Regions:
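Extreme N-terminal leader/targeting segments of oxidoreductases
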Residues: 1-78, 96-97, 489
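Mid-domain catalytic core of redox enzymes
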Residues: 2-6, 37, 296-404, 417, ...
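Conserved flavin/dinucleotide-binding core of flavoenzymes
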Residues: 3-8, 12, 63-71, 379-499
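N-terminal Rossmann-like FAD-binding beta1-loop-alpha1 element of flavoenzymes
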Residues: 73-103
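Short beta-strand to alpha-helix junction loop
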Residues: 130-136, 208-214, 218, 223, ...
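Helical element adjacent to the flavin cofactor pocket in flavoenzyme catalytic cores
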Residues: 253-307, 311-315
Length: 499
């Protein structure tokens, strides 16, 4: 089991097209603390499901006014369309400054892609999420002790060409990296890698952004990293961190991601990633967020909805995913996406008795990485069972049966990687997210404008970096722009970048 992380908290008038503001995904609703009462995490309800059925929600309390009722006219200082992490972050900062806010969400739950569902007592995140203690906005925006972050092991387990080895630090954040039992180069190569990561951890952002910008793959090839070190550790680690199997991501983004890895610890909340949006929502006044409200069009002075009338405002923020934002704000930059497919299996006992990220460095394998979530925190699985999450990256032709068709191959590969008989494991479900991560090829604009025009704003990870840090930072930037234009605060310096 992973121990809690002892962390400190840092200081810290145009109409658009007639589309829905946020994609209502066919997934179970989560309790909505911003609308009446605190949410409770999913509770175990039964033994393992015998088949790969769709996850069912635990029975949440029904908050007061959980779903908006039809009405004709509403008004607040700011209307935010989308109750994902970016939108909730913007709402939190605006309300803290004394501005009245209404958040409209088309779905029946908050959180967007950062969702956790109960499946017969197993906590399944909506996709493979990893947080990092080095994310600056994580500590600036959230109450970290209440988030109950659980750290992954400081080292990673790598499989390549039939061999297994560990690479990592023995404890704590990485002032330097030590490597044991790892056939990734000579002792000199391993020392160079540890020194390089230590230097990277101390490198200022401005210096990283001054480097020539290439694709990650090309930059790695040109930096003189020994092939065994590159293929045996750096490449598979970056693939897992970026969700990009071809490493076409900007080399500057890759440098920031590696720096974050060297500085901090990969981690997850004890109650699943939905704990992040739930905590954000809990900080908002009751009634701030209205679920089940589909938006037809937006302008700087209001939002027109399908069934709930018009919401007037002095400023309007679109905080949906990039596709929906582009429908509401024609002409907005539209990124490509990296798909992420996550398979969930249950086992009677853990195949790895520690919360260690497993990297599959075999180019012929369908897998990128895997993690025993029940070792991160036992509450991820009921009754002492083990929960294993494994990730397949990239676009694939799964055939007429979809991602389930790949499950037998994934399970066999997991057995090989963990050195166990996985034939008796239960397949719980698979989550396929074709638009999981906005792509960040070079040249990548780290801070796309959040101000469309005075009174009209946009935020989301597609305006920053494709991570929880990007969503949090983008929401903060949008709120700052609104407050500046409303005359509440003066312009301030931009915070430090992180991937």
């Amino acid at each position: 089991m992973s121990a809690p992380i002892p962390l400190h908290q840092p200081q810290s008038q145009q109409s658009a097209s007639q589309q829905s503001a946020s994609q209502a995904q066919p997934h179970p609703a989560q309790p909505h603390p911003a609308q009446g009462r605190p949410a409770s995490p999913p509770q175990p309800s039964s033994p393992h499901a015998p088949h790969a059925a769709a996850p069912q929600p635990s029975a949440p309390p029904v908050p007061q006014q959980r779903t908006a009722q039809p009405s004709r006219q509403h008004r607040s200082d700011v209307v935010i369309v989308g109750a994902g992490v970016a939108g909730l972050t913007a709402a939190r900062h605006l309300i803290a400054a004394g501005v009245s806010v209404t958040v409209l969400e088309a779905a029946d739950r908050i959180g967007g892609r950062m969702a956790t569902f109960d499946h017969h007592g197993f906590r399944l995140d909506h996709g493979a999420h990893l947080l990092n203690t080095s994310f600056p906005d994580l500590g600036d925006t959230l109450d970290l002790p209440r988030l109950e972050l659980r750290a992954l092991a400081p080292d990673v387990l790598v499989h390549r060409r039939g061999r297994e080895y560990q690479v990592g630090a023995p404890s704590g954040p990485r002032p330097a990296l030590t490597i044991g039992r790892a056939p990734i180069g000579s002792p000199w190569d391993r020392a160079r890698l540890g020194a390089a990561l230590a230097r990277l951890a101390a490198t200022p952002t401005a210096k990283l952004l001054a480097r020539p910008e290439l694709t990650s793959a090309r930059a790695l090839a040109e930096r003189g990293i020994p092939a065994r070190t590159l293929d045996g550790f750096v490449r598979p680690l970056l693939v897992a961190l970026l969700g990009d199997p071809a490493l076409g991501t900007s080399s500057r983004v890759a440098d920031l991601a590696l720096r974050g890895y060297a500085r901090g610890r990969l981690c997850l909340p004890a109650n699943g990633v939905s704990a992040v949006p739930l905590q954000l929502a809990e900080s908002l006044p009751a009634g701030t967020v209205r679920l089940g409200v589909s938006v037809r069009s937006v302008s700087a002075d209001g939002v027109d909805t399908e069934r709930h009338g018009r919401f007037g405002c002095r400023a309007m923020v679109v905080a949906t995913d990039a596709r929906r934002a582009g429908e509401l704000l024609p002409g907005l930059h539209q990124p490509d996406y990296h798909p992420v497919t996550t398979y969930y299996h249950a086992a009677g006992e853990s195949p790895r008795p520690e919360p260690q990220l497993l990297l599959d460095a075999d180019s012929r394998s369908p897998l990128s990485h895997a993690l025993v979530l029940s070792e991160v925190d036992p509450s991820y699985a009921p009754g002492g069972a083990a929960l294993i999450a494994s990730t397949v990256l990239g676009r694939r032709d799964f055939g007429p049966d979809g991602p389930r068709a790949l499950e037998p191959l994934v399970r066999r590969r997991l057995g090989q990687l963990y050195g166990v008989d996985s034939g008796g494991w239960e397949f719980l479900t698979v989550r396929h997210l074709p638009d999981a991560l906005p792509a960040m090829p070079p040249p990548h604009h780290f801070r796309r404008p959040v101000r469309v025009l005075r009174g009209l704003y946009v935020c989301g990870d597609h305006r920053e970096t494709s991570s929880a840090q990007g969503a949090l930072a983008s929401g903060h930037r949008a709120a700052t722009a609104v407050l500046q234009d409303l005359g509440v605060i003066r312009a301030s310096a931009a915070p430090e970048l992180a991937a």
